[in-house]
Amino acid sequence: MLDPKFLRNELEVTAERLATRGFILDIAHLTQLEEKRKSLQVATEELQASRNAISKSIGQAKARGEDVDAIMAQVGDLGSQLDAKKIELAAVLEEVNAIAMSMPNLPDESAPIGADETENVEVRRWGTPRTFDFPIKDHIDLGEGLNGLDFKNAVKITGSRFIVMKGQVARLNRAIGQFMLDLHTTEHGYTEAYVPLLVNEASLLGTGQLPKFGEDLFHTKPATEEGQGLSLIPTAEVPLTNLVRDSIVDEDELPIKLTAHTACFRSEAGSYGKDTRGLIRQHQFDKVEMVQIVKPEDSMAALEALTGHAETVLQRLGLPYRTVILCTGDMGFGSSKTYDIEVWLPAQNTYREISSCSNMKDFQARRMQARYRVKADNKPALLHTLNGSGLAVGRTLVAILENYQNADGSITIPEVLRPYMGGLTKIG
């Protein structure tokens, strides 16, 4: 959520910056609402003051033995007018808030201006894609050949965009997640967290999935009243970031760095026809998430560090990748600046996204009322929040299967994963 004061005082600037994201702000309507809000606010305050003043005179009139019926009737009339104005004001404020909640974050000045992913800017590459001297197989053929990826039974059990993993492929998938968690907790300074996979509406509003992206979520509808309104998490960013919702954190506690390995659930609304085969785009997938909660002046440096932590995973696994900065038209709703990390997939002969690392600045914190107490003046101020995939486990499995494949269909295990695989150097 944007700063209301900045929005009111810099409406034209806000509209221009949001336009670079493809969001058209109706300045005339918002100005009209703001003028109406001011008018109703003044009228409400004046009616309140008049009623208070006349109410005080009732006691004085009674003390003088005067009839107060007329005064009481006047107070009642003012009260009715006041109630009506309050209802009008509440309606205007609700509409203003709805507009504010629908606005994406302002892009950072360092984010390149562009319309879509074709205008993202590459900032670096690591590793050299392997040259194969045999026909390359994709992860689907490799996984099925190892009897480790079972798409047929997943469709039978649930439907499309789900997977059953078995045997050494399932073990490799588990090893990938464990390696990522160990790396982030032992070397990168994150605290591991176990979080609910179901969250309430307030949590989804806080991180920005609601109200705009409800169709992307899986919502539960249990029979019990207690469970109403819960949704499966699309990312562990939601529960991890909401740990500071409605809180004031001591400055000495910052930065807060959290990581979690969870299943994630997405309806993939709007993705019809995209990546219909394989593990690239699933309704249920595992991801290791990183979240940082920091002071405002530290957030841009934290974004660089966070992105580096995700890149380190790929470097340790020996997987070639490139990092791009997203242009304004391709950034996520709540992001001010985002780096995407794309891993090399030989079977597709291209780089595909495996991590997205974003600085939300105070956008989520304002929605969540997540603050810290500044030592200098002992006053609360909004935090800055960041999040990034470290990494998407299923896509990492895809990258390992394809990049480490052998001519006979077996897969060489990356060295850093061998301790998690009981010392195995190869599967298949």
From Swiss-Prot:
Keywords: Aminoacyl-tRNA synthetase, ATP-binding, Cytoplasm, Ligase, Nucleotide-binding, Protein biosynthesis
Name under which the protein is recorded: Serine--tRNA ligase
Function: Catalyzes the attachment of serine to tRNA(Ser). Is also able to aminoacylate tRNA(Sec) with serine, to form the misacylated tRNA L-seryl-tRNA(Sec), which will be further converted into selenocysteinyl-tRNA(Sec).
Originating gene: serS
Gene Ontology BP, a term: seryl-tRNA aminoacylation
Subunit structure: Homodimer. The tRNA molecule binds across the dimer.
Lineage, highest ranks first: Bacteria, Pseudomonadati, Pseudomonadota, Gammaproteobacteria, Alteromonadales
Pfam families assigned to the protein according to its UniProt record, in alphabetical order: Seryl_tRNA_N (PF02403), tRNA-synt_2b (PF00587)
Highest taxon above the source species: Bacteria
